From Swiss-Prot:
The record marks F82 as: Plays a critical role in the stabilization of intermediate cation. One of its GO terms (biological process) is terpenoid biosynthetic process. Gene3D superfamilies: Farnesyl Diphosphate Synthase. Mg(2+) 1 binds at D85, D89. This is (-)-beta-caryophyllene synthase ((2E,6E)-farnesyl diphosphate cyclizing). It is an enzyme of class 4 (lyase). Its cofactor is Mg(2+). A motif (DDXXD motif) lies at residues 85-89. It comes from the Bacteria. It comes from Saccharothrix espanaensis (strain ATCC 51144 / DSM 44229 / JCM 9112 / NBRC 15066 / NRRL 15764). Pathway: Secondary metabolite biosynthesis; terpenoid biosynthesis. Substrate binds at R179, K232, R320, F321. It catalyses: (2E,6E)-farnesyl diphosphate = (-)-(E)-beta-caryophyllene + diphosphate. The record marks D86, E160 as: Plays a critical role for substrate recognition.
Amino acid sequence: MGRPATPQQTAFHIPFPRAISPDVSAVHPGSMAWLRRHGMLRSDASARRVDGWRLTELAGRFFPDARGEDLRLGADVMGFFFLFDDQFDHPGGLRAEAVAVSKRLLHLTSLPAGPAPEGAGPVVAAWADLWNRSCQGMSSAWRVRAAREWRRYFVGNLEESVAREGMSGESVEDYLRLRAMTIGTTPVYDLCERTQHFEIPDEVLHSHHVQAMRDLATEIVVLCNDVASTIKESARGETLNAVLLLERHHEAERGPAVARVQRMVEARLAAFRRLRDRTSRTCAALDLTAEQCDRVDRYVRTALMSVVRGNYDWQQRSARFSADDARPGSLPGYLDDLVGHSGVVGPPPVDGS
């Protein structure tokens, strides 16, 4: 086998079945319209760029059993994730406006689902809409843990922005711990339940067994993404990328660094499969019913495995990782400034105000 034409085409053997919702094409126009309606897409150029990222396809791969409005919700969340993430990619570092919006989002996660506050701006209003829709039909326990994962994500973006300016000597392991907060997989795992109409029993979700599987799945996604985005992030002078960290730490050439990341993925896949094969023992030890065990199995298949496999299949096709999509490091990573027009003035309101 010859070398891939680009890092984006690097092969990973993901031993999980390929799956995708049949409703991807049907929900795509509505999802793009939602992004425009909420001010997340402000120009035709941005719309063309996002269209090339194939985010509705990503949702279809992440949530293969989702249909109709459930898949639309998943697609809208994908649009939010990527457009919000890019707001932190600024040549001047972490912007005060991004911090202000993040604080407002963090405040909302502590409140019951409801309409966005007046004058919230596009990012906050869009997330409030997503959160309202996400909570529909879900238990209070799910809402509590889903809000917690969103908080970790919002805080993680701030931490990553600070680390981006100084993380050059840290190990790949340190980097992975930080990136696990911002890659967005843990809110997605929760959304897998919401869009596919089930909930994993709390007692097994919080077991070391399932938490270890979640951590492994997240690290696999991070590492695969880092390989695919190597050229794009190198061109922007990015430091938070496993391949680029290995090049600096070990003075490795690009090829050997990519090969090492491939081995890291293989090791994590092997560990994941060992845990998956022992899941029934954990269910038995927790004295779960047959119906509860079925939900655990579904979580493993249509949340963890579908995210790992779906991410890999998508990243090989998405323009998100192409060199053509990259902007010079002297420019922001976004086309539309969504937080500079946020309308947020001062700190978020205190509880009860």
